[in-house]
Amino acid sequence: MRKPVLWIVALVVVIAAGGGGYYGWTRLGDYSGQQFRTGLDQWIKTLPPGYSMTYKTAEYNVATDKATLGGVALKGTGTQVFDATIDNVEVTKPSADFANAWAQAAANPAALAPDKALPVAGSITVKGATIHFGAASGTMASAKLDGLRLYPWALLHSGVPSFTDVQAALTAKRTEQPQLADVLPLLRFEASILLGIGYDTYAVEDMRVTATVPATPQMPATDVTYTIRKFGGSGYDRGVRGDAELEGATIAAAPMGTITIERASMADLKFQQPLTQLLAGDPPVPEMLDGLAIGKIEYVGMKATTPDGKEIPVGTVSISKIGFSHGVPISGELGYAGLKLSKALMPDARSREAFDKLGLDTLTVSLGFTYQWDLDQKRMTVRNVALKIDELGALNLSADLADMTPGAGWQTRGSLSHVLLRYDDASLADRAFKAAALETNADPAALRQQVIAMVDMRAASLGDSPAIAAAVAALKSFLGEPKSLTIELAPPAPVAFSALQAAGALPPGDIAALIGLTISANK
């Protein structure tokens, strides 16, 4: 989604810089449109070999401090082959000294401060943009960018490869499995761009991108079409993003199918610190993730359509509160709801038979979890690890772990402090008894009693400790009238993972005492 927008932004920036580069925006009040066109024409003559630009109209309104270009066409015929056109460009309140400030920055980039910004314009509006590049093309009905500014410290940073160099490096490895070293030039180039721009707000309407992806041994050739009705946001600055929203996205990949997204949003994304390290040429290591944060990313109303036209409601997914420290994830939340699995969409007879045995045509699935790791306290908490199938039941897990330190071998160093597992039955138990009875030609009620009797028989070999007896009673109660079953582990003191691994040799009663086992039903 970002690439076509960056192409247009880059085009507008060079137009703005070129138009005022010879005589300066400050003199437009004296010369108005004619001087603007003269400066623009002279700048066009300085384009590198393989690039050309034309325009049909170019005007400057002194009263509104607005430059307007019509019928803009820009072509690349060298290493980067592309063809871009824009029906109309409006630049309001262009920076009076952008060209001079940029020239000064380029003359001594080592002296630049990372947060030194060069304002480009108060507002830039683009209408009717089209670009063709290779096997891809993009169109945009309109786009508006307010408060665009550039940070030459990043854009002119020493050692950053050019886009041509990045393309050459990737092309050379196209027939091989790419390694991390192969994509480092691309990562560094993109870090320069993302750290080199900022803007106050943006809004785009009716964007469409099409591309043909060549066939691979694993996949056929694919025609991809990506459309968005509108998207916009506010507050992006050097790798720190505020709010952004999208409405009406469709991704069609023939012949594989289509995905539609009713709405998407993101907020409070921070990746300035990792980008700065990449820009400096630091090798990627886990600690580079420190400082990366995701406030929230959410996709609402997702739907997939199969090649034969069948629709699959995918639902809503969100990730939030993602944070890292010392190279490990220390917090995060995941939520997913609304996936509908239909018997009619199952690809094989065995799957459809499973639906029939349960007496269902559709399963509605949701899941989620919340995670935190306090590295100073060496404590990890996991909450609401939930899997819910509306038609069958819901499983929910919470856990507290102690002595958790990052690094290899953590599974031998940690300790279990508390675990709570709860199952709330909607109909699964009764459906399972009915399905089993149907296969064995038995009565469901009689089969239920047989299973309860088997629990009693098995319990006899587990000893007569109070914890075991209470667990058996709870399990029998649940089987007789399935509503809920809760399993809690609350040891008197945290139990090391190594001790848990060795506990298999202990008598059942001793194991129950070690882990503080409690099982209750229908509470």
Where are these regions (language model features)?
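Glycine-rich, small/hydroxylated-residue low-complexity segments
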Residues: 18-523
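N-terminal Sec-pathway targeting helices
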Residues: 1-17, 21
